[in-house]
Design a protein with these regions (language model features):
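Extended, low-hydrophobicity, polar/charged segments
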Residues: 1-131
Length: 131
């Protein structure tokens, strides 16, 4: 599925590689920015979408963070630009489902994706989990 089918791709003039930079770019708090974290679970990759201000307890998942090279290989996107729409299993923090809109990676350092978290679940693109 194309990113445009899930939300609005916002082109930026300056690169955004961190939650803080993304929040500044759209003029919102860091709590409105989400990050997509890719983990390696014994050679199988998964992605977790969570609020930019939250940390993912990778050890409790029995996984490890994917290396930048693994992220690119597994998703086709660089670290910092990974969107929430992927060809690997995606899990979204259920606390995000109450948000009208959030902003996440848009596929590169010069774009963000504005989307409704609930749409990912309704379209079968992500499974809600308690993180």
């Amino acid at each position: 599925m194309r990113l445009e089918e899930v939300g609005e791709v916002i082109a930026l003039r300056t690169p955004v590689r961190t939650v803080r930079e993304a929040a500044r770019a759209v003029g919102l708090g860091e709590d409105k920015i989400v990050k997509t974290i890719v983990v390696n679970c014994g050679g199988k990759f998964r992605a977790y979408i969570l609020r930019g201000t939250k940390r993912l307890d990778v050890k409790s998942l029995g996984c490890r963070l994917a290396t930048p090279e693994e992220v690119l290989l597994a998703t086709g996107y660089p670290v910092g630009g990974v969107p929430p729409v992927l060809d690997i299993p995606v899990f979204i923090d259920e606390e995000l489902l109450g948000e009208d809109y959030v902003y996440g990676g848009g596929g590169n350092d010069y774009s963000l994706l504005k989307f409704k978290p609930r749409d990912l679940v309704e379209k079968g693109l992500a499974k809600p989990v308690a993180l």
